[in-house]
Amino acid sequence: MAQELDFETKVFEKEIIEVAGTKEAIVRGGRHLLPLLPEALQGVSTIGVIGWGSQGPAQAQNLRDSLAGTDITVKVGLRAGSASVASAREAGFNEEDGTLGDMFDIVRESDFAIVLISDAAMAEHYEEIFAALKPGATLGLSHGFLLGHLDNEGATFPENVNVVAVCPKGMGPSVRALYVQGAEVNGAGINASFAIQQDVDGRATDHALAWSVALGSPYTFQTTMQSEYRSDIFGERGILLGAVHGLVESLYRHFREEGAAPEDAFRRSAESITGPISKTISHHGIIGVFEQLDAAGKEIFNRAYDVTYLPMKAVLQEIYDEVRSGNEIRSVVVAGSRLERYPMPTIDQTEMWHVGETVRAARVEEEIPLDPFTAGAYCATMMAQIDVLDEAGHPLSEIVNESVIEATDSLNPYMHARGIAYMVDNCSVTARLGSRKWAPRFDYAMVQESFPALDAAESETKASSSFVGHRIHDVLDKVGQLRPSVDIFVAS
């Protein structure tokens, strides 16, 4: 059963929505709310954004732009000798006016310290960060990873600070891109979840909501920090990055083995997912993909769905169990030191991705096929992820954002523009590690289980029989009304 959470805000308008019989409290965003930010950020004169990885540049610039004309200053803190100093200067932060400095100095100066360094760096430096926090300050995180690490270590947050999370449901570049591209469209941006881990002065909720509104979130929904990190780490290893990578690699080879030309195999696999399938899901839900097909196409969709759902769900359940147990967090922490000796290799060197460069160069968007087999396999994997999260009791908004909206509105457009590496490697180190680790498992599941099952007269399971009536379609219909008000544009 999905969690039902509620909160109180002194500044913003809370709205109760009902999705599939479950009530959720949300706040709709929009630039008309920006004048409320100083009131919501009561007690805050300096916001420090620590780190300049995937989320740092987007969040620092969005916060600065949203707070322009107020008495609240946004500063960026980076480690000594950081290679990102030049990029931060180019974005308008500099030492001369005090908006760029050493990370620990900026933490000490901040009333609201938003720490966006890599998870491995967080695990290494959290004690120094905690020591630098002002008593009564608000510590902001965009990922609950640190809570999981503290639990593993038997440690806790300092008792004299607020601890909140605002977690955009998309990679950092898309958080900035939709904010800029939607400058004239009220509410454009990336949806976000928020969580309150500690509230020492009664201001934590409004601080978190103000942060989310300032980032441009069309709507902000509540979760817990534990639920967030479990769904987030799981999701990026699943359909958001790892699963879709493994799936398209296996589909490409499958179509080639059936006799398809390289370009056609790429169009039917990767292009079909990042083009018409993603666009249809974004605007009409997962069920919309099925409804677009003719009778023959629906039969192929169902066949692909039936042979894909259980093998992919088994891998997804294993990932969720590894995250819940703390093992996946430990793996990321250990990888932090290993990466200095063994940097992550590229992931776009197979035939498929070289063919993709040629296909994209000659692409006619309207001619990309919605392949029914690919659609069935992709939707089955997405639904399997939804079911794993639902069975674990996650909030419904969190489920659809981590499994559907983030995929179609934030991540897949980057693969569509420039290929798999451009999508995966614009994400956090934790996401990049997880995608590389688990993508081969999804590929293996398709090759060893799903494709051989096609030769059987009938699938042993009829997973597709529960697809059309699944309650997630009603949830997506409701939540889809709150989607970003513009479609992201990613230059190829």
Locate each region found by the language model.
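NAD(P)-binding Rossmann-fold cofactor-contacting core
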Residues: I16-I17, R64-F93
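Glycine-rich adenosine-cofactor-binding loop
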Residues: V44-L63, R363, M382
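NAD(P)-dependent Rossmann-like dehydrogenase/reductase catalytic/cofactor-binding core
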Residues: A2-R31, A188, E249, E257-S492
